A protein has these predicted regions:
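Soluble "head" domains of membrane/secretory-pathway proteins
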Residues: 2-26, 62-308
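Hydrophobic membrane-insertion alpha-helices, especially the h-region
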Residues: 29-47
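Generic N-terminal helix/loop capping motif
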Residues: 37, 41, 50, 72, ...
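Single-residue recognition of alpha-helix boundary sites
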Residues: 43, 56-57, 83, 263
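Short linear Ser/Thr-Pro motifs
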Residues: 46, 56-58, 257
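Alpha-helical transmembrane signal-anchor/signal-peptide segments
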Residues: 50-67
Length: 308
């Protein structure tokens, strides 16, 4: 066989090997880029940004059912993950460091603390409401007007207001927190929002108000009335010092919102983050016979709307 033909075959083999090596390197680089992007997205979702949707009209018209929102999870603190990554299995969290404090009028996303007689809430149930009362504040509602520390608080500019009917003062609503009051959603309180380190005297007049919060702090039903004595964990108690900061929250559409009036206060460690922006919005109901598709179901004027 001539030498030239042997050399030509050898050169071809080398070119094929080089091509194979380059292809493998490109594949590895691509997979590495995908892996880095995945890890970055996972870190971002775990610690910084969360996406969620609005299912109800309780925050109308600030937020509408069908809005897709971004939540700043780092607005107040950085915590360890609340869930095992890529699952819905909740795990205990630990605060790593603080980045700020929730303020009145902040729109927050939080883990639902439970109904008014419920100590252990449902897992993975998140609510979105507006902070009205901060730790230590006194909140009262008179004929649908909210007062904090005796000062009238104006409604959010986009909130739905329905003045067609107001429940009279003294007409009790059995759904209202706490039990045993003559309050209703339009005439509520006054109630003091618990603050970490705040000590309250306990008596038969206020134990229904504070008992649930104390039970939740112990994560067990520890408050009891034994004859004429109030006990906590079996020991007589005339007072209690709160271990956490709490917030009183309301929906902007107050006539169609289940909020602190019905199930009590939100502890600070249940707050997920602050609502930032609407990044997408779809009408939840499209008129029958409308065949225009998704284009006309999008609320284009709400995309990139900042949440105030």
């Amino acid at each position: 066989m001539p030498d030239g033909e042997v050399k030509k075959e050898t050169d071809g083999t080398v070119e094929e090997k080089n091509s194979y090596v380059i292809s493998r390197l490109k594949s590895r680089q691509f997979l590495r880029a995908i892996l880095i992007a995945f890890i970055a997205a996972l870190i971002l979702k775990t610690f910084i940004i969360e996406a969620d949707t609005i299912p109800t009209g309780s925050m109308e018209n600030t937020l509408l059912a069908g809005d897709f929102i971004l939540i700043n999870k780092a607005a107040y603190e950085i915590t360890t993950p609340r869930f095992i990554p890529l699952t819905s299995i909740s795990i205990p969290t630990e605060k790593l460091f603080s980045t700020g404090s929730p303020k009145r009028n902040d729109v927050i996303v939080f883990k639902f603390p439970g109904y008014k007689n419920q100590i252990h809430p449902y897992d993975n149930l998140y609510f979105i409401k507006r902070i009205i009362g901060c730790p230590g504040d006194t909140v009262q509602i008179k004929d649908k007007v909210v007062y904090v520390n005796g000062k009238k608080i104006s409604r959010p500019p986009e909130a739905i207001i329905n003045n067609d009917y107001t429940m009279k003062k003294g007409r009790s609503d059995p759904r209202i927190f706490p039990d045993g009051t003559d309050w209703n959603s339009d005439n509520y309180g006054p109630v003091v929002v618990p603050k970490k380190g705040m000590t309250v005297n306990l008596d038969f007049g206020n134990i229904r108000e504070w008992g649930l919060i104390i039970d939740r702090e112990f994560n067990s039903r520890v408050v009891a009335i034994e004859g004429s004595v109030i006990t906590i964990n079996g020991a007589p108690a005339r007072s209690y010092t709160f271990k956490k900061n709490y917030y009183f929250v309301l929906g902007d559409n107050r006539d169609d919102s289940m909020d602190s009036r019905y199930w009590g206060f939100v502890p600070d460690d249940d707050i997920i983050g602050k609502a930032m922006m609407v990044y997408w919005s779809l009408k939840t109901q499209v008129p029958a016979g409308n065949n225009s598709g998704i284009f006309h179901s999008v609320r284009w004027n709400r995309i990139f709307k900042i949440i105030h």
